[in-house]
């Protein structure tokens, strides 16, 4: 008996050594630290849930992937071209400016021209849609076959794909990409055929090169190698015996443009790489888009013509500006694309920082907040799937740091303890017996190269949908645990499985298990939520904010675990997606949405349309708030454009008719707090306590993924901190800056084990102890005294020659009104600096007095340095001469504070750009608030302070005098002689109140006679 006991003990030791706690004993599971994932599809435990919809979700993606032998390993999903891999041919794809579709007969090519686009309001449903037509301008076919058997993915890179249509030996390989106005076609066992429903107008015929227009005036070119001439001119079918052709979408019917496109028509793009860097010292994310081409004829250049989206050309690096083809423009669903030629171009964006939570700076009732925290312990998951459970653990991860701040350390550990229990369950694929579980596990599908969580939801398994949304919540929970327990987060413990989930939705290049950046489109700048994209409108994404939530959580997790490469990759994704959201979801610059489109947000962005509707209903709040939730320490980008925040809020309030929000009231309050926290507090206090303990069936006041505690904490913090200030950056990634009435607050969190000193771009610095927020506001000016004599007033004209430093410019006497000097001899890259410009309030525009006898250029307004934060820009035209002066206007986003302002000049290096005489900033409520233009003058009212306005009159011909006639609230008429300043006449009116109505007119002298204007009305 003793010998047998020894043998049994030895066997138990072997088992323990082979399968330590948390490791997998199943041959169908792979151990990762203390966790594991399944490699065999599990037998799903439905837990008594018989709903067919739920059961249908618990499957796998399609077994068949349409790809050639050239494409091996993990398969790219969630792309704009994804349907090519899962359809026998494909659904519509949107490689802007084209839309294309593979069919049995060939490739259908279409350009969704502006006249095809429609804005449709469904008033009964409460939805809006911006959509184009689905059609065919012509079909690219193969001379050797009338019908192909299938289309497959033959190759792909960061933004191009090669589709292969095949029927035995008859093959047609088609290379096309988003942002490419070319389609490259290569033939096997046959040659080119272009088929039209109506014969095209061939307006340029040069043998192997033709320019043609469709019956509805869309302009194209077709290129074959020299010596291979086109046939069938005048008919509905054009043919060419070449085994290679290129199709180009021309911006206009223009022979010179056709010649430019011919230069690159024989340079087939074989690779395209978006290579990015993050400069931690400056917060700059630089992305270089580069192509590698193969010459189809001798001498073809290694380059192409790109079509840039607004989010790209708005942030184009100065080194790439001279490559722009400004007149080469395409109008698409996302606004205007602009052409650029070359091998590469570069964009520069500014990373604004994220936080693990807001700090403990709110003026709140701490006992009340603690009560809300304890109330939240009664909350529970609203589902067993990766999304509903994800929302629950995301909620717990938000509550834990607030509990820490309130000194409720046991409660904070209770929240984190529950997070650990849930994650550790899900991160193990096997049960205590070593067998695969039937739920609460992750399974690796080798066919596609993806991790699938069960229970699944929203087609996260069957279509590979929403992985960044769902798994982002798991990473949020892990990041909060790691903030307090670094041991738990180590790879040999549970961190390895968290890293695996992250790799699934944002893997690096050359990952053995997963495709590169599964969810993200480097060229379009946004994520795509659908894995397969089998829709006629292409791929789509609804909750852009949950994408930003995912990138935020990876930044926090990577910073907590010391993974700098992962952190920087997430910063690239966060910063780039932010720029796309501002354009295509919010239209903060008011240049994307058509004028007839009513809402201030697009809820779902598609390749081929834009929807103001959700996937599940048409609730008014949901159509906005699905692109806000969940609020967290990375949500501060939502407040970067306060003018837009106010527009969106007011449009939502107007649509509902009151502040009695129909659902998710707390999300509206939290959004409102970005610009008007006092109003947000009033709304919150009026109804937050009408919500008792957690009730998932009642989301009118509190959305199920949030809590009263977080809502109360968030709004009170913003009431004390003020507005988010993105104009100041830091040399550390976990930070935020706020500005309240000109006083900045600097927030930093330090995940490391040592104290750090963080430098800000405005000269401020902060020391932060390990594993904590900073205490106090650090060193450096945060609230400069406006009375200091050396401060410059941006709302009065600043003479250009009164600079504090410059590079490259000279001064000369000016003929402009007022005399004095102007600056001139300005070339690309020159700049002037104006120190200590003090903005007492937001500025939204700048006026610059300019003259130019060349095509002009652009003036960038930056702070801190010539390459500092970009606040706005102004386009300068040819004015007709070096002393022919015009006033040009541009938009800026400047919050209160004191800055060193730089005017940086951009344009062609081949000539002098412009002269500048003066510039002036306009505050919100100035400039366009009340302005009237007449051939003789521009006149109106600009706001100055809370109780003052300036009435201005700018005559087009010099006036010897201007009088203003004024009535306030229909009172006695007052008459004043106005004061002339550099050709513009002004009169300040004081002691006004909100709601006052001003009626005013002018009498002015012009070349001897005097004239009187009509009366104008302005309401305060």
Curated annotation (Swiss-Prot):
Function: Cleaves internal linkages in 1,3-beta-glucan. May contribute to plant biomass degradation.
Protein's name in the database: Glucan endo-1,3-beta-D-glucosidase
Gene3D superfamilies (UniProt xref): Galactose-binding domain-like (2.60.120.260), Golgi alpha-mannosidase II, domain 4 (2.70.98.30)
Effect on the protein of changing residue 542 to Q: Abolishes enzyme activity
Subcellular location: Secreted
Record field: catalytic activity: Hydrolysis of (1->3)-beta-D-glucosidic linkages in (1->3)-beta-D-glucans
Keywords: Carbohydrate metabolism, Cell wall biogenesis/degradation, Glycosidase, Hydrolase, Polysaccharide degradation, Secreted, Signal
Residues the record marks as active site: 466, 542, 546
CDD domains: CBM6_xylanase-like
Entries under InterPro entries matching the protein: CBM56, CBM6, Cellulose-bd_IV, Endo-beta-glucanase, Galactose-bd-like_sf, GH81_C, GH81_N
Highest taxon above the source species: Bacteria
Recorded GO CC terms: extracellular region
TM annotation in the entry: none
Domain (CBM56): residue spans on this chain: 928-1020
Keyword Cell wall biogenesis/degradation: yes
Enzyme class: hydrolase
GH81 domain segment(s): 28-722
Signal sequence residues: 1-25
Region (Disordered): 771-790
Organism per entry: Halalkalibacterium halodurans (strain ATCC BAA-125 / DSM 18197 / FERM 7344 / JCM 9153 / C-125)
Binding site for (1,3-beta-D-glucosyl)n: 387, 391, 458, 466, 470, 530, 540, 542, 546, 699, 704, 812, 825, 853, 878, 912, 915
